[in-house]
Curated annotation (Swiss-Prot):
Organism per entry: Thermoanaerobacter sp. (strain X514)
Top-level EC class as recorded in UniProt: transferase
SUPFAM superfamilies (UniProt xref): S-adenosyl-L-methionine-dependent methyltransferases
Name of the protein in question: Ribosomal protein L11 methyltransferase
Molecular-function GO terms, alphabetical: protein-lysine N-methyltransferase activity
Residues noted as binding S-adenosyl-L-methionine in the record, renumbered to the chain: T160, G181, D203, N245
Keywords from the UniProt entry: Cytoplasm, Methyltransferase, S-adenosyl-L-methionine, Transferase
């Protein structure tokens, strides 16, 4: 089967918005190629293996979308271009925006992204292992089996990496964890393997919910429940930890609601915040939470806070 590959060159800031537009237009798959992520991992002591072919020049990211050939494909591509340009009106920098279109075979793209995803060690003992890769654990390493599919969350993105580092320090044996906007389920699965008693993971996107469920099953976990929810809407009870790796606007919305779902002195781990909006997010969080620590990496920051 033939597919249309649409390659969009843009900025890291626009990455998530561009990806969302592609999914909304019916892309059969989306691949993000970010050479800056590879460089950051290479400079860190906390990585296991990166193939030499991944080291490319720094620069803008490339987002690839794959659409089945149909009568309306050209219209979809034009809409995609218009909507990406429109992002500028929302204050999102799209950089030297460029679009390239080509025709490819299904076999060429459906596994293409896997070459950029290798076993990765994060923090002191967390290892994210693609389900198709071989890896022998060493010492007390915790192996997270993952097949992200079309959902966000592989461990290579700065926001996910910082969340994992925080979780390694804050998850306790009796912890109840709420994962809001769970994506691939990577944070929920890690929380469980770090010893959490119960983990509840939700996403508004049905594809993410299904991918997360598959990854929970892949890791043979019984204490992680995955369901569809618009933010905290379908969660019940109270948690010791709420983790949300989303975007700044959603973190701001959550800041007033999260305390109702947290136990006394519960922790709120918020990520997906672009550095330029850190101050704004902090101002919205502080009426409800005491900020304990902030991590920064690349263009992103992650905030750990405690319920007042």
């Amino acid at each position: 089967m033939k597919w249309i590959e649409v390659q969009v060159t843009t900025t890291q800031e626009a990455e998530e918005a561009v990806t969302n537009i592609m999914h909304e237009l019916g892309a059969g798959g989306v691949v993000i190629k970010n050479p800056n992520d590879v460089k950051l991992l290479a400079q860190s002591d906390n990585w296991d293996y990166l193939d030499s072919s991944l080291f490319e020049e720094e620069g803008n990211i490339k987002v690839f979308a794959y659409f089945p050939i149909a009568s309306d494909t050209t219209d979809k591509i034009n809409i995609l271009k218009d909507r990406i340009v429109e992002l500028k009106s929302f204050g999102i920098d799209i950089g030297n925006f460029d679009v390239k279109v080509s025709e490819v075979d299904e076999a060429d793209w459906e596994n293409n992204w896997k070459q950029y995803y290798k076993p990765l060690k994060i923090g002191k003992k967390i290892v994210i292992k693609p389900s198709w890769e071989e890896y022998v654990s060493q010492g007390e390493e915790i192996i997270i089996e993952l097949d992200p599919g079309m959902a966000f969350g592989t461990g290579t993105h700065e926001t996910t990496k910082m969340c994992l580092e925080f979780l390694e320090d804050i998850v306790m044996p009796e912890s109840i964890v709420f994962d809001v906007g769970c994506g691939s389920g990577i944070l929920s699965i890690t929380s469980s393997k770090l010893g959490a008693k119960e983990v509840y993971a939700a996403d508004i996107d049905e594809v993410s919910v299904e991918v997360a469920r598959q990854n929970v099953e892949l890791n043979n976990l019984q204490n992680v429940k995955v369901f569809k929810s618009d933010l905290l809407g379908e969660f019940r009870g109270k948690a010791d930890i709420i983790v949300a790796n989303i975007i700044a606007d959603v973190i701001i919305r959550l800041s007033a609601e999260a305390p109702k779902y947290l136990k006394e002195e519960g922790l709120f781990l918020a990520s997906g915040i672009i550095k330029s909006r850190k101050k704004e997010v902090m101002e919205k969080i502080q009426p409800f939470f005491e900020i304990l620590q902030i991590k920064e990496e690349g263009e992103w920051c992650t905030i750990l806070s405690r319920k007042k």
